[in-house]
Amino acid sequence: HRRENLKLIPEYFERISELASSNPDLQFILPIHPNPEIRKHIDLLKDVLVIEPLPYDDMISAISKCRLIISDSGGIQEEASFFKKKIIVCRKKTERLASIGSSSTLCKEPNDLKESFNQYKENYIVEEECPYGDGTSSEQIVEILKCVI
């Protein structure tokens, strides 16, 4: 969905379709971004279940249940780390460097997607702790505030 990737969308969709076709044992689901510049390439997605964007809670549920994620979203990159899911980040660079090498890898070009996918396809379990925290920050803040107030 990133502007930097708009010209690459057709190539990424073709690579994703190739992965889906060559891995019939896996279900590929793509919540499609509402941007018309992305949607106009939907016909390139073969063997991929294309769905409308998911509400946040449904997206979190999908992330928690999936095996592997391919995305260019930094937010999804963070959520994937929290749920110990491997993610292939389709960008030349990311602002979220903490998870690179553990739960995420950069896929800088569409033609690199197959290699990244094959690397993570069988090796999809994340052993490392989430670099963005354990999900208890609000409770920790409340405890600190109780001591201060």
Language model features with spans:
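Nucleotide-activated sugar donor-binding and catalytic core shared by glycosyltransferases
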Residues: R2-L30, N35-I149
